[in-house]
A protein has these predicted regions:
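N-terminal cap/lid segment of alpha/beta-hydrolase-fold proteins
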Residues: 5-45
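Conserved alpha/beta-hydrolase "acid-adjacent" motif
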Residues: 251-257
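Hydrolase active-site cap/lid region
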Residues: 149-215, 273
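Catalytic histidine neighborhood in serine/cysteine hydrolases
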Residues: 263-279
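Catalytic histidine-centered segment of alpha/beta-hydrolase-like enzymes
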Residues: 276-289
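Cap/lid segment of the alpha/beta-hydrolase catalytic domain
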Residues: 65-70, 76-115
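Short beta-strand element of the alpha/beta-hydrolase
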Residues: 38-39, 47-55
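Short beta-strand/loop motif that positions the catalytic acidic residue
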Residues: 238, 244-246, 250
Length: 298
């Protein structure tokens, strides 16, 4: 089994209304709510199309639409894809996004990352069929992680923008505020601890990365399963020009996480630091938009 590549990513339209298209998810899922992919479309009648991927558990859908709406005003057909287990795709009895933080089981987490990536690939194919022309991708926070993976698996993404995101699950699991709930679970089930995780990432992860020569990641072959869905594992294969934004006071994505991801990307790239926290980075959305637009034109 190869991560994300064992699943079809041909789009099948289930419903269209107003500016929303609903696709069938090609990833098998136990929750019917996440078996459909809602996509908000903003048509600029352009030969350039950008897909925007939101972050984890975001509460307000309205402000997420600001980026695709703004790209549309600047000449890009744009789309906002709702991630699995979020908003209308949230299973009954759960909160938006919490299924990414509700378990320490690496195999379940891997499947949820994989589900997200397969849905992105399916959506990109839909946008390519509908609008033709060039494709671009932007991911915010968790959306940046799965956008990184998706970009490594395609050769037709012309530009990638990553905001307040990162890789290396040692930093994300043990140094991030948002994953505190996972650390509590680890303390209880003894599956992992900071010392054990650090040894894996210091000793075995570099060797694992060195031995990879393409982004076809075989499942159940890594020393630990989290290597198989870490954005860093895929980032070394990105050839797409990439712009990144790091929040200086980010307690969700540690600095080392962002820098590790940035440093391993082997393409034309730029990194900008913004004087905000993670959530407050939205206050500088116009700066992020302006820098991204300039970068994508180059």
């Amino acid at each position: 089994m190869i991560f994300a590549k064992n699943y079809d990513n041909n789009p099948k339209v289930l419903k269209e209304f107003d500016n929303v298209v609903v696709l069938k998810s090609n990833y098998p899922c136990e929750y019917p709510e996440s078996s459909k992919i809602p996509i908000y479309i903003y048509n600029a009648n352009s030969n350039k199309t950008l897909l925007f991927i939101h972050g984890l558990g975001t509460r307000n859908l309205k402000y997420l639409k600001w980026f695709p709406e703004s790209f549309a005003r600047n000449g890009y057909n744009s789309a906002l894809m709702i991630l699995p287990y979020h908003f209308d795709r949230t299973p009954k009895g759960h909160k938006s996004g919490e299924l990414f933080l509700s378990t320490t089981d690496n195999y379940i987490l891997r499947s949820r990352f994989e589900h997200s990536v397969v849905d992105i690939l399916t959506t990109l194919n839909y946008l390519k069929e509908r609008f033709k022309g060039d494709l671009y991708l932007m991911g915010f926070s968790f959306g940046g992680m799965v956008s990184t993976i998706a970009t490594s698996l395609r050769n037709d993404i012309k530009g990638l923008s990553l905001a307040v995101t990162g890789g290396n699950f040692y930093h994300i699991t043990w140094k991030s505020f948002v994953t505190g709930v996972l650390r509590v679970q680890y303390e209880e089930n003894k599956e992992c601890n900071p010392e054990k995780c650090l040894l894996y990432h210091k000793n075995e992860y570099p060797e694992y990365l060195k031995n990879l020569n393409k982004p076809d990641i075989e499942l159940d072959k890594a020393p630990i399963a989290c290597f198989e869905y870490d954005p860093m594992t895929f980032a070394k294969f990105i050839k797409t020009p990439t712009i990144m934004f790091r929040a200086l006071f980010d307690i969700f994505i540690p600095k080392n996480s962002t820098m590790d991801l940035y440093n391993i990307i082997n393409a034309k790239k730029e990194l900008y630091s913004i004087p905000t926290g993670h959530l407050s980075s939205f206050l500088l959305r116009k700066y992020i938009l302006r820098k991204t637009l300039t970068f994508l034109k180059e």
